[in-house]
């Protein structure tokens, strides 16, 4: 049975020792991270979900401050320069980042904090917080992943090709993470995440 570890000593400790828990949820674009995350939060309101900042435009139905903090590229670069992110990365031509202060405050207060982030950011967090629990979500097959990405109907053929190439590369990194979960059956994948978090 996997235990979620408390973060005691961070590799980059200018911060105080942390008493809460940090969970990283990552995987390639289109694998269902966001849908799994939303269901997890509905079933477990005690979890703290870290809302990321991004420079990409909102998708239909996304709400600023709930889905993401939508900011301009110049504002994002200013926040990077000020050290306001725990991690930041560029993906598909847009920046994404995890706000530092809110996450550290929640972890220090003893909360279970879940970060749903891209691979590059997940690697940064694992370096800074080696005791964080990391979960990599995999598609049942690459063909299914392609169907999901195309099914969104939001990207050009060129953007889809870029996402698919990046997804191939990211899937190769799955073994870097503590737990790998295949999102074939949604409910089973959700339950596997719950077991990892709560035992």
UniProtKB/Swiss-Prot annotation:
Any idea which UniProt keywords this protein has? ATP-binding, Cytoplasm, Kinase, Nucleotide-binding, Transferase
Q: Where does ATP bind?
A: 27-34
Is Transferase included in the keywords of this UniProt record? yes
Identify the main location: cytoplasm
* EC number of this enzyme: 2.7.4.8
Function, as annotated, reads:
Essential for recycling GMP and indirectly, cGMP.
- HAMAP family, alphabetically? Guanylate_kinase (MF_00328)
The UniProt entry, under InterPro entries, shows: GK/Ca_channel_bsu, Guanylate_kin-like_dom, Guanylate_kinase, Guanylate_kinase_CS, P-loop_NTPase
The UniProt GO MF terms for this protein read: ATP binding; guanylate kinase activity
**Record domain Guanylate kinase-like: where:** 20-198
Reactions accelerated catalytically: GMP + ATP = GDP + ADP
Subcellular location, record wording: Cytoplasm
* Keyword Iron-sulfur belongs to the record: no
Belongs to which family? Belongs to the guanylate kinase family.
**A GO CC term attached to the entry:** cytosol
> Per its record, how is this protein called by name?
Guanylate kinase
